[in-house]
């Protein structure tokens, strides 16, 4: 019998993703935190009235963090 350790990322009682590595689970959780903050920021803009689109855009930006940092000049190409 094998023992398998799984790390579950959960938000508001809902299972979002399961990982076998704690580092991967932590990275995903951090990305979700960033998406939550971006969602709040996008909501303040009133450019996107559809919350679903705000959520999709926030998730896209969080998933593409490195490219976003380059685009806004917070990080330089080496």
Where do the PLM segments sit?
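Short, charge-rich amphipathic interface segments used for partner binding and complex assembly
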Residues: 47-78
């Amino acid at each position: 019998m094998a023992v398998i350790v799984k790390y579950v990322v959960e938000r508001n009682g809902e299972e979002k993703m399961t990982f076998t590595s704690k580092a991967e689970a932590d990275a995903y959780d951090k990305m979700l935190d960033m998406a939550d903050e971006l969602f709040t920021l996008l909501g303040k803009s009133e450019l996107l009235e559809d919350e679903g689109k705000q959520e999709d855009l926030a998730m896209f930006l969080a998933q593409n963090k490195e490219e976003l940092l380059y685009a806004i000049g917070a990080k330089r190409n080496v």
